[in-house]
């Protein structure tokens, strides 16, 4: 996609971090005018992803301040560009992690634009015209229609918001490994947070035997009785880990804390696969023997394409897969950040841009 000079004249109210303290405060900024390929969205809800906290605090050393986080956006279309035919005013829509891609490389042409080397991020990115992208902690968003999805009518807009990142992050590895539409496998989910709890829901909806693997014994009841997991393995219990060696076909590792993969690899059957979707900030540690002795595979996966995101939302509507959330008002973002840092949420905070805080189970 060629660089274009854009006019940024729309004054928008939002919430931003201005330094590495990560404190979020009200912030007024400008967005571009709605272009021929754009839709303007009145934001209703925006999920809080753990990466929002990392970026706000510059934990990864890439933050450009002031930063307006948020890439789990749901809202209503209010303006439609002249080239846009698949959205209309009043449509329920969502925006995830991507603002744009080149649309010309091999990955973009294969509907895998999430692997485009020139991907433009929804926030804390540099857009084609050199401007900084601002995310969904705001009242209004302007997006290229090619990076917008329809939110099915049956999905509540608040509980659908985290699906734009967490949902597609968990769905795509299952699809890529032939686990959608082919039931009967044994799946393991490492970690039962915002990502992991959705992994359990997807796995069960797709007809698999699901095992939650966690360091927290307190999560066993929640995993089995409320989320419907078939088994629970306490990973700090050597006897439980030993008893379950070579018992799982496929593992999704959602954990971003530093941890060794070795013990988890041994849970896999011969030819089993472990996919990383968490992002530890230090090199991953594992001995090669569990890998080579079981002909096992370790892979990575990041979000999903726009086509996959729409497919995922449609499947969530079909199976009634929803994120478990706690809604907050914008003035409580810093409280939510503090709690998120302590893993004190079940399982995702969602900001209600209109106010009216409630909690959803």
Regions found by a protein language model. Name each.
Residues 1-10, 212, 217, 306-361:
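C-terminal hydrophobic helical "lid"/dimerization subdomain
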Residues 1-74, 139-145, 354-361:
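Short N-terminal strand-loop motif that marks the start
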Residues 30-46, 59-109, 150-154, 214:
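Glycine-rich beta-strand-centered segment in the early N-terminal region that forms part
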Residues 102-190:
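NAD(P)H dinucleotide-binding glycine-rich loop of Rossmann-like/cofactor-binding domains
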Residues 166, 191-195, 279:
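Glycine-rich Rossmann-fold phosphate-binding loop(s) that bind the pyrophosphate
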Residues 183-192, 200-263:
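Adenosine-nucleotide cofactor-binding segment
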Residues 268-269:
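Helix-to-beta-strand junctions that scaffold the AdoMet/dcAdoMet cofactor pocket
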Residues 278-295, 306-314:
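Rossmann-fold NAD(P)-binding glycine/threonine-rich loop
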